[in-house]
Design a protein with these regions (language model features):
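Peptidyl-prolyl cis-trans isomerase
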Residues: 2-252
């Protein structure tokens, strides 16, 4: 491969083969190549599809909004901004258009699998807000359970007796993924009602009383969750595509 200039630093050219050596020395070559392969796969896919048309008006309006938001409406100031960011209008325009195409591609890649993927992941996506009191022997746990049943304050007992750090916030653990709970805890939490205290349950040599505060079931109607799942499916698709590539690093 004929070596060509990649950068000029203090009027001294840095050729591609030297740039690669710098990346190797810094341990960043693999990441650099990975970024190139990602972009290669994405652009190849976009070029071969006919369902990713983006309206020029959308791109132009996005640029107008960007300029207004960042006080770049003056042509001279905008031109200076482009130069400062080592780009020009045509390249900037293409980058905005590409971002829309990428988001549309993610939707198209994920749409056939997202419902099934959601079901597979649901146990990890469902969350429960719970509070706990953790002690180091069953007898204490049972005594605390009795006190709670007789009207004792769960919050106060958590502050006084719990060994977990969340005792400072009345034992409140916050939202916990069902999929990350120990099996024995999830089994009783799943059939409990909000406000109910369950336990004692032995977990890693300690005993816990758990109060269910609120169930937070996941839903595909949640646009933020839907976006996250689309991104996960897209990344899986992208990794599979990259793994099938034949890549050779050529240096003169």
């Amino acid at each position: 491969m004929e070596s060509s200039s990649f950068l000029t630093v203090n009027d001294q050219p840095i050729f591609i083969n030297q740039a690669v050596k710098y990346l190797q020395a810094s341990g960043k070559l693999a990441h650099f190549i990975g970024d190139i392969l990602r972009q290669y796969v994405i652009e190849q896919e976009i070029q071969t599809r006919y369902d990713i048309a983006i309206s020029p008006a959308l791109t132009e309006q996005t640029i107008i909004d960007f300029r207004l938001k960042n006080q770049l409406n003056d042509p001279q100031i905008f031109q200076e901004w482009l130069q400062k960011n080592v780009t020009d209008y045509a390249t900037f325009y293409e980058s905005i258009a590409f971002s829309f195409k990428l988001e549309k591609l993610k939707v198209l890649i994920a749409e056939a699998k997202i419902s099934e993927y959601f079901i597979e992941r649901k146990i990890f996506l469902d969350r429960v807000i719970i509070s706990r009191i953790v002690v180091d022997n069953r007898e204490i746990a049972e005594e605390l359970q009795t006190q709670i049943e007789e009207g004792g304050s769960f919050e106060q007992l958590a502050k006084e007796y719990s060994l977990s750090e969340d005792r400072m916030v009345n034992g409140m653990m916050g939202p916990v993924s069902r999929g990350t709970m120990p099996d024995q805890l999830r089994a009783v939490i799943d059939i409990a009602n909000p406000g109910q205290v369950v336990g004692p349950i032995e977990i890693e040599g300690r005993y816990g009383l758990f109060r269910v505060e609120q169930f937070l079931p996941a839903s595909l109607e949640d646009t933020q969750l839907q976006q996250a799942l689309q991104n996960e499916l897209f990344e899986k698709w992208l990794v599979e595509k990259i793994q099938k590539l034949t890549v050779k690093l050529q240096m003169s």
